[in-house]
Amino acid sequence: MATTLATDVRLSIAHQTRFALRLASTISSNPKSAASNAVFSPVSLHVALSLLAAGAGSATRDQLVATLGTGEVEGLHALAEQVVQFVLADASSAGGPHVAFANGVFVDASLPLKPSFQELAVCKYKADTQSVDFQTKAAEVATQVNSWVEKVTSGRIKDILPSGSVDNTTKLVLANALYFKGAWTDQFDSSGTKNDYFYLPDGSSVQTPFMSSMDDQYLSSSDGLKVLKLPYKQGGDKRQFSMYILLPEAPGGLSNLAEKLSAEPDFLERHIPRQRVALRQFKLPKFKISFETEASDLLKCLGLQLPFSNEADFSEMVDSPMAHGLRVSSVFHQAFVEVNEQGTEAAASTAIKMALLQARPPSVMDFIADHPFLFLLREDISGVVLFMGHVVNPLLSS
């Protein structure tokens, strides 16, 4: 049974990665998002939607499961349990990255949660379930949720629920928050950081600080793509977190890369670098990105329609005749990432209202990230993607 469960979880993680890549492709194809830097947390969205599926019935549940990519809802819960208890556990006391993650279910006092949903939320998702008063104290509840998220993300995400987004018609808010701060295994010497040109999608350029290093780096190069792996210091932690920079050789190749990642499920894994190589030149820009979106339309583009419609069925969530009137009205998502000489700080929050062989690379290579690129942060043992995004101009913070 343990072996079967492990196999099921590994399969679910592969589906989570596919979900992440489909999201990235959809964001990159949006003209507004493609023209600016973007970052999002696939795991934050995935866990929030999985918890939503736990309270959904019939066709609504089936559509959530299909969108998230697993064959059955139990696979979502098994994955969420592994993610929450293993992948996103804090490792700072062992010398590894500081990771903080929390789930919350805030339900109006007029709608008691079903015991089965509450037990699943608490045991599998480690969610804090709270009965609140949306009808007469909606603004206070919004402040409570925002303060909770701000605390978990060490102040990086302050207002996951925008002003006026919660009112006396709100019945339920599912929210989660994620924070990550890790130091590179091989930190960059800040004295080597110098301004250089970064070429923008429109052909113009800006001067921005580039980090550099003489150390050998994990790098692969094939199919018109270079992939850089930057491991984080782990200390005594058994997990291995890494950031990946996916640099298309063509300066305008970002959207094509995102499409290829989405269309070919094994494309990313095929290009993960397995060995260090000597670099003749190595330049990576520092960047800091804040990104927020109301993600309903994004999820609808992935085929998730029923939870937002009048046909939504959340009868497994609340013990009330009003359950059949519940639907998702908003999905607020915010993310933050900063990459500098020391390492990476990243945070995200979602609120739902309602071993392969590789050809050996050339002995000496260059890696100069002087045009738009994709990046992702993942835990390598499990393959879970925590953050993903793209940089089109390192000088832009949002």
UniProtKB/Swiss-Prot annotation:
Chain residue ranges for the region called RCL: 343-367
Annotated site residues (Reactive bond) in this chain: 357-358
Keyword Metal-binding (UniProt): no
Pfam families for the chain: Serpin
Record's keyword terms, sorted: Protease inhibitor, Serine protease inhibitor
GO molecular function: serine-type endopeptidase inhibitor activity
A GO CC term attached to the entry: extracellular space
Membership in a protein family: Belongs to the serpin family.
Function: Inhibits chymotrypsin and cathepsin G in vitro.
Record note on domains: The reactive center loop (RCL) extends out from the body of the protein and directs binding to the target protease. The protease cleaves the serpin at the reactive site within the RCL, establishing a covalent linkage between the carboxyl group of the serpin reactive site and the serine hydroxyl of the protease. The resulting inactive serpin-protease complex is highly stable.
Name assigned to this protein: Serpin-Z1C
Species of provenance: Triticum aestivum (Wheat)
Taxonomic placement: Eukaryota, Viridiplantae, Streptophyta, Embryophyta, Tracheophyta
